[in-house]
Swiss-Prot record:
Record-linked InterPro entries: SAM-dependent_MTases_sf
Keyword Lipoprotein found: no
Chain residue ranges for the region called Disordered: 1-23
Keyword terms: Methyltransferase, Nucleus, S-adenosyl-L-methionine, Sporulation, Transcription, Transcription regulation, Transferase
CDD domains hit by this protein: AdoMet_MTases
Organism: Hypocrea jecorina (strain QM6a)
Pfam families: Methyltransf_23
SUPFAM superfamilies assigned: S-adenosyl-L-methionine-dependent methyltransferases
Protein name, as recorded: Secondary metabolism regulator LAE1
Origin superkingdom: Eukaryota
Keyword Transcription assigned: yes
Inducers of expression: Expression is negatively regulated by protein kinase A.
Length: 332
């Protein structure tokens, strides 16, 4: 698909991802091979299983409820591009040192694209540990970056980097058990450099709101968000975002000097503002690519829905997202 789709929206049958803005990251799903990487640097996934038409990781099954196939990795890279556009091309808002070799951890790194972006364009001498439950990062990585397969719900973080100037987390709601968040923040606090360390977390509230009073009579997007929240709540891995609750948890872990920024993630480019339209195009693409991936395991396992029901719901939600008079947005 071209960068600018018709009306800036993604037809449900044509949702494909553009090239990633930094390192090209791709996943090849195939039979096990003796070497972990191909000549092109693509990683061949060896451990996992197919379910509901998608490929899932098999290390600690049930902890990460979303697929790790090529389509999903493309979606994660598109979301990275959206975050860059929405935040004025800033890969982080943390004031990192330009001299020396700052230590950074990226928790829930996914494809690793954020970590690679930091070391290639922002802090070239940084030492970065990119941590994830799944080994879905490419075999060829920039100098200064190491990848680590690790479950951050584990009691001990001894294998992880210490004295960090920044610990970065993004889109981890739904991946961490509700009762484990205090532990995650406490361990993050312990692994930051005293007096100079920062934690930075970005989450999206998927429940749509509307800019005006022109609302769909029966919103498929709202129905999807309600069902998704309900299913994830039954896993005790909530995706309901509360800045106040997050702040209380961080304060209890020892953090101080908070800064919170809210950005509206418009689902289509209705705005006359050029930057808002560009943001909306990328968010529409990323959201459209992810609807079914986010839905299949939770809604089938916890709500008893069928795959056909979910495909129909997601298709209706995608179509609604492309109607420009419905000025819906999520919040970042």
């Amino acid at each position: 698909m071209s960068r600018n789709a018709p009306n800036g929206c993604v037809p449900p049958s044509q949702a494909t991802a553009p090239p990633s803005p930094a390192t090209s990251l791709r996943l090849t799903v195939g039979e096990p091979v003796s070497e972990p990487a191909t000549e092109s640097g693509e990683r061949v996934l060896q451990d996992g299983f197919w379910e509901h038409g998608r490929f899932y990781g098999s290390w600690k099954p049930g902890k990460y409820l979303f697929p790790i196939d090529k389509e999903e990795l493309n979606r994660l890279d598109v979301f990275h591009k959206y975050f860059l556009v929405a935040r004025d091309e800033k890969v982080t808002s943390t004031p990192l040192r330009k001299d020396g070799r700052p230590k950074i951890m990226d928790l829930g790194t996914g494809t690793g694209i954020w970590a690679y972006n930091v070391v290639e364009e922002y802090a070239k001498d940084a030492e970065i540990m990119a941590v994830d439950l799944n080994q879905i990062q490419p075999a060829l990585i920039p100098r200064g970056v190491t990848t680590k397969q690790f479950d951050i719900e584990e009691p001990s973080w001894d294998p992880l980097l210490r004295d960090c100037e920044l610990i970065h987390m993004r889109l981890l709601y739904g991946s961490i058990r509700d009762d484990k968040w205090p532990h995650v923040y406490r361990k993050a606090f312990e692994h930051l450099a005293p007096g100079i360390g920062y934690i930075e977390q970005l989450e999206i509230d998927w429940m749509p709101r509307w800019e005006n009073e022109d609302l769909p009579r029966h919103s498929a997007l709202q129905e999807w968000a309600q069902l998704f929240q309900r299913a994830m709540h039954r896993y005790h891995r909530s995706v309901t975002v509360s800045g106040e609750a997050t702040r209380r948890r961080m304060e209890a872990a020892g953090f101080t000097d908070f800064s919170e920024t809210t950005i509206r993630c418009y689902v289509n480019p209705w705005s006359p503002d050029r930057h808002q339209r560009e943001c909306a195009r990328w968010f529409n693409l990323a959201f459209s690519l992810g609807l079914e991936a986010m839905s299949m395991m939770p809604m089938i396992d916890k709500l008893g829905m069928t795959k056909d029901d979910i495909v129909d719901l997601c298709s209706r939600a995608k179509k609604e997202m492309c109607i420009l008079r419905y000025r819906a947005y999520c919040t970042l």
